């Protein structure tokens, strides 16, 4: 996988995740809407980590800020996974498969970043 396509995956994932959040909020009510707000925060943490990583790679931000990339990614992905687990217990009538798909995408995002960091 080229470096350019590896950089485009996080952008694609954020669009997919935000579309899923919109779908959940439209069809599941207020609890789902609160879950979506928390999920947007989770996705924002992952996007912030990607932006910081891109700024470091382009030498616009000093290298010593690289220590914040992984904590932001882990915090965003794990909080999204935790939100998905909590939401499935709260949203009894909601589409649980969509919520678990969100958790799966956040976990995939984390593993993709790990793989790109090791072999990139």
Curated annotation (Swiss-Prot):
Its main location: membrane. It is a multi-pass membrane protein. It is found in: Membrane. The chain crosses the membrane at residues 9-29, 32-52, 68-88, 94-114. Induction: Expressed in the intermediate phase of the viral replicative cycle. The keyword rRNA-binding does not apply. One of its GO terms (cellular component) is membrane. Keywords: Membrane, Transmembrane, Transmembrane helix. The keyword Transmembrane applies. This is Uncharacterized protein gp19. It comes from Escherichia phage Mu (Bacteriophage Mu).
